């Protein structure tokens, strides 16, 4: 909702979405998040844009952090953002992508812990939305987490799971374990 891009220099930054663009395609609810750019784009701007969209009559929510590690938050932690910031419903991360921070399974578990505590304390549920690239590891760390900690799978939301055939097959397995899968 605050635009994206920037991977080819400042001139490649994508502008913010407009209200007329949202209405033209029938959108009633949006989820804003930062992607690769957790530096020139700010969570404060994302929050302000979500509030502005709400003020204009649509529903808007946001994820805290961006592709990278350590997580970036508005307050002191991912859990604090979920608990105390009305618009925050989860956290963003990237993995298996050359732009990702290559998070370990333990790092992912620590973020899930924050999302889970913040989610149930705030009554929002909480979600860890994970951008996937096409690197060979795919979602293997998420599959390991799902196998060893089945109660945590409901907090995981991997996306772009159709980049490769191998990733698609992992997604099918993840879905069979009870996980959400997204093929956008």
Show where each model-derived region lies.
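A glycine-rich helix N-cap at a beta->alpha junction
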Residues: 52-66
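Active-site mouth loops of central-metabolism enzymes
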Residues: 2-13, 63-72, 98-102
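Metal-associated gating/positioning segment near the N- to mid-region
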Residues: 1-48
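Generic structural signal for hydrophobic
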Residues: 22, 53, 171-174
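Hydrophobic faces of well-ordered beta-strands that scaffold small-molecule active sites
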Residues: 1, 30-32, 60-64, 87-95, ...
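Active-site gating/metal-coordination segments in enzymes
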Residues: 70-127, 180-182
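Active-site-proximal loop/turn and secondary-structure-junction residues that shape catalytic pockets
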Residues: 36-38, 66-69, 95-97, 134-136, ...
């Amino acid at each position: 909702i605050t635009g994206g891009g920037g991977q080819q220099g400042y001139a490649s930054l994508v502008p913010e979405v407009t209200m007329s663009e949202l209405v033209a395609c029938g959108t009633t609810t949006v989820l804003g998040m930062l992607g690769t750019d957790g530096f020139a784009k700010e969570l404060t701007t994302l929050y302000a844009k979500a509030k502005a969209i709400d003020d204009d009559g649509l529903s808007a929510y946001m994820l805290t952090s961006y592709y990278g590690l350590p997580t970036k938050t508005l307050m002191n932690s991912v859990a604090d953002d979920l608990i105390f910031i009305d618009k925050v419903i989860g956290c963003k991360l990237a993995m298996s992508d050359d732009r990702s921070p290559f998070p370990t399974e333990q790092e992912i578990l620590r973020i899930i812990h924050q999302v889970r505590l913040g989610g149930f304390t705030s009554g929002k549920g909480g979600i860890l939305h994970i951008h996937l690239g096409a690197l060979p590891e795919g979602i293997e760390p998420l599959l390991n987490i799902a196998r060893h900690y089945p109660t945590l799978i409901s907090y995981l939301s991997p996306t772009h799971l159709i980049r490769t055939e191998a990733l698609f097959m992992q997604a099918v397995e993840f879905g069979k374990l009870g996980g959400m899968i997204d093929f956008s």
